[in-house]
């Protein structure tokens, strides 16, 4: 990649000043991610309760973190409750995406019912991490879903929830009442929610024979440590993204970046790849064990997703979830496989 003084003023390209600031920004973002680690798992759990798949939850988390970094860079006052701040950003991001899609109309209403502030303890709390709860939650309209999760799972007060969702405590009470009533009614229905109600959004590539064949070819190239073969499976304009940390575009960047880091001679680990199906999608799991360590155990350390090119058996985008500990844990753990997580940043 050409940078700096190779370009005269006013010509296309990256100036020295831009290159230097990009390095500073990249390190600042990594420091920011590390600073948020204490609350990240809780914020991911909140995103997961709103979304139908692990992939959608991580997308929402990453968009939330990106917006949080931009907002933090413009704040002069301290952030008094980091988790609540991130939950507010995540909620607004999620609701905005629904509004843009035209799938839902979002209005607050205040009921005339005199509802208690907290109500009786709800059995939702004991089921907070169960997939059955997530399915039931998807029966609720967006704002009711957010209110139920924030109150019954995360134990925020009505005033705190009202602040996060930019509404009134009375409207939160009303949404909680309606949402809890819907969930209790659903629990009494032995048939449970219909698959149509809780199914994730369309994923055209999932389960498609051509998509699985592409993943198997890519996994075979990984296992052969054949970087030339790996690169040949990408579009010329293809992308490789280490989610939350790095993006590479084009054969040259992809070869020099993630592929050489993982499969080059200086890598500290030995890798092996397998193809699996999880949460509606065919994926690649990357296994690793330490090089030159006799008897070292092999564990899943990464989850990879491929977006195929339109009309061609090539990779348009490859996502590595190496620095997404919640995704690695949910996917590998859900498949009953040993795994390790890797923090949230290179440094």
Language model region names:
Residues 87-109, 185:
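Arg/Lys-rich amphipathic alpha helix in sigma70-family domain 2
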Residues 147-148:
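A short pre-motif secondary-structure segment
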Residues 104-126, 196-200:
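Internal acidic/polar
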Residues 170, 176-272:
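Solvent-exposed, charged amphipathic helical/linker segments at domain boundaries
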Residues 9-45, 55-58:
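A short, charge-rich alpha-helical start-of-domain segment used by transcription regulators
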Residues 154-171:
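Helix-turn-helix DNA-binding module
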Residues 45, 59-66, 80-92:
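Structural recognition of an alpha-helix C-terminal capping motif at a helix-to-coil junction
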């Amino acid at each position: 990649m050409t940078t700096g003084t190779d370009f005269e003023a006013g010509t296309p390209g990256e100036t020295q000043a831009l290159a230097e600031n990009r390095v500073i920004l990249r390190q600042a973002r990594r420091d920011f991610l590390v600073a948020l680690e204490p609350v990240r798992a809780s914020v991911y759990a909140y995103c997961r309760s709103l979304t139908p798949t692990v992939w959608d939850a991580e997308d929402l988390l990453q968009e939330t973190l990106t917006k949080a970094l931009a907002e933090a860079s413009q704040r002069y006052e301290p952030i008094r409750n980091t988790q609540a701040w991130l939950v507010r950003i995540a909620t607004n991001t999620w609701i905005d995406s629904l509004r843009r899609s035209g799938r839902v109309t979002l209005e607050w209403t205040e009921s005339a019912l005199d509802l208690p502030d907290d109500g009786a303890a709800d059995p939702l709390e004991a089921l907070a991490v169960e997939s059955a709860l997530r399915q039931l939650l998807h029966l609720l309209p967006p704002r009711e879903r957010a209110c139920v999760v924030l109150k019954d799972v995360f134990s925020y007060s009505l005033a705190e929830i009202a602040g996060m969702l930019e509404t009134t405590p009375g409207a939160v009470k009303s949404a909680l009442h309606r949402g809890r009533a819907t969930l209790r009614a659903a629990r009494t229905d032995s048939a449970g929610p219909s698959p149509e109600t809780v199914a994730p959004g369309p994923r055209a590539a999932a389960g498609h024979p051509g998509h699985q064949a592409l993943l198997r070819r890519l996994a075979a190239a990984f296992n052969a440590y054949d970087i030339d073969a790996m690169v040949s499976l990408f579009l010329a304009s293809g992308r490789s993204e280490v989610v939350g940390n790095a993006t590479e575009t084009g054969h040259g960047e992809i070869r020099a970046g993630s592929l050489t880091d993982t499969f080059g001679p200086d890598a500290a680990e030995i890798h092996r790849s397998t193809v699996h199906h999880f949460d509606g999608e065919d994926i690649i799991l990357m296994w690793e064990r330490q090089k030159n360590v006799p008897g070292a155990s092999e564990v899943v350390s990464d989850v990879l997703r491929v977006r195929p090119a339109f009309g061609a058996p090539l990779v348009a985008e490859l996502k590595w979830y190496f620095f997404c500990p919640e995704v690695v844990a949910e996917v590998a753990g859900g498949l009953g496989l040993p795994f390790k997580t890797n923090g949230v940043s290179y440094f």
